[in-house]
Amino acid sequence: MSEKEKKELTQECEELKEKYKELEEYAKRLKAEYENYREEVAREKRELIKNANEYLISKLIPVLDDFERALNQGEKGDAFYEGVKMIYKKLLNVLEKEGLTKIHVGEKFDPFEHEAVERVETEDVEEYTILEVVESGYKFHGKVLKPAKVKVAVKPRKKEERKVEEPSDKKE
C-alpha cells in the first residue's frame, strides 16, 4: 500500500468518524425530542382527564346539594333516611377519591371560597364571622367549583339623623 493510499484511507476514516459523531448527536437529539414529546402527550392526557373529571363532578354537585337537603328534612333513625344517608356518603366518598373536597367553613368569611347570601347585623360576634352555612361549597384539586353559601355577621348600621331639605321654589 502506498503512502498516498494510506493517507486517503486515513482521511476517509477521519471523515467517517466525523460523520458517525454527527449521526450519534442527531440520534441523541431525536431521542431527547421523543422523550419530551412523550412527556408532553402524557401531561396533556392527564390534563384532559382532569378537565373531564372536573366537568362531570361539577354536574354532580347539585345532586350532593339535593342529598343534603333531603337529609336535613328527614328524620334520623328512619330506615329511608339511613338509606339516603348511606348513598350520599358513598357518592361523596367516590368523588373525594377523585379530588373533590368540601370547603371547610372557618370562622372568617373568605370571598374566594364563600358566597354571602345574607348579612346578619349583630354585635355578638366579630364582623365577617360566618354564622351559618346555607349550602356546602366544593373544590376540585384546589379549584373552587362552587363557593359555600353562608350567612355573615356584620356590624349594625348606625341610624343617623338625616336632615330633610325642602325643595326650593326658586328658579334661576
UniProtKB/Swiss-Prot annotation:
Example of a GO biological process term: protein folding
GO MF annotations in UniProt: adenyl-nucleotide exchange factor activity; protein homodimerization activity; protein-folding chaperone binding; unfolded protein binding
Keyword list, A-Z: Chaperone, Cytoplasm, Stress response
Keyword Coiled coil: no
Keyword Metal-binding: no
One GO cellular component term: cytoplasm
Gene3D superfamilies recorded: 3.90.20.20, Head domain of nucleotide exchange factor GrpE (2.30.22.10)
Record InterPro entries: GrpE, GrpE_coiled_coil, GrpE_head
One family name in Pfam for this protein: GrpE
Compartment annotation: Cytoplasm
Main location class: cytoplasm
CDD domains (alphabetical): GrpE (cd00446)
PANTHER family: GRPE PROTEIN, GRPE PROTEIN HOMOLOG, MITOCHONDRIAL
Subunit composition and interactions: Homodimer.
Record-stated family: Belongs to the GrpE family.
Protein task: Participates actively in the response to hyperosmotic and heat shock by preventing the aggregation of stress-denatured proteins, in association with DnaK and GrpE. It is the nucleotide exchange factor for DnaK and may function as a thermosensor. Unfolded proteins bind initially to DnaJ; upon interaction with the DnaJ-bound protein, DnaK hydrolyzes its bound ATP, resulting in the formation of a stable complex. GrpE releases ADP from DnaK; ATP binding to DnaK triggers the release of the substrate protein, thus completing the reaction cycle.
Protein name: Protein GrpE
Species the sequence originates in: Thermotoga maritima (strain ATCC 43589 / DSM 3109 / JCM 10099 / NBRC 100826 / MSB8)
Gene it is expressed from: grpE
